């Protein structure tokens, strides 16, 4: 089926095709273009709308400017029995982190657990996509990254010195959806702010503040110079700091004042850092028993007493529901984003979404 502008729905295959075609046009090899398209589409399918095709114009701009390498030589170095460091050669973060996940799974098969860092990587999109990669090997996955720009202050601070450095963990289940927690360390992700700006939706009054006055900012068009607040106050700021040190500093990637703003400085190399952890649950008990226990707890918790008019949700429930719906029905893309993607398709000489 083709995109239906009346319904506002775009088939997943059309989105994937647009991403892949644009990557090919800027010199990305076919196999890499397919991998990038797969991972970007997965972000859209699971509901991480600010990390899928929404990012395509930015990625294309960086590839054109040369601040992202379209043909990186990604290498794995400093490998030990349970650790490794992936050097991304300034390639697309999707390629670098997926290589890190593959390496972590391979090492964890031998050692039971592996931690793999990334340096000279780039923006990779939704954290939950990468934490979930070890699920395919029946392993627990964890992921964190240094965010693509600093928008958040330390506790009591008035300077944006921290990114929204995300963390995700994915735990395999049997018949139930896997448990997947994917969180920014800010009260909301900055991608959410950008989505609100794109759709002209007011911000919640506890999301951003004016750095001069401390007053709430609710106009999404005034967000560029506002401070994004950490989740749970100093706790969220502390998590952002520690994840930044582990994903950035530990790997020789950038963190803190050194970070390059992915959005405002498109011509500069970001040297983004990430890490992936893979853990084999069969080293602790029989795999099927563990997955059955995850199922049992999931059902018990999901069926617990809910507040009036609400239902109990577990991390990963909405993700699984959205994914099934969007595969079946297509993706709902904002009108402004459709305009941007149509303009990009025209510039790149590829089919627009509605033509696919």
Protein language model annotation of sequence segments:
Residues 2, 6-18, 254-356:
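Catalytic-core signal marking the mid-to-C-terminal active-site face
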Residues 8-14, 28-54, 68-79, 268-271, ...:
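N-terminal glycine-rich anion-binding loops that anchor highly charged ligand groups
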Residues 51-105:
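Active-site cofactor/substrate anionic-group-binding motifs, chiefly glycine-
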Residues 190-255, 269:
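Small-residue-enriched flexible segments
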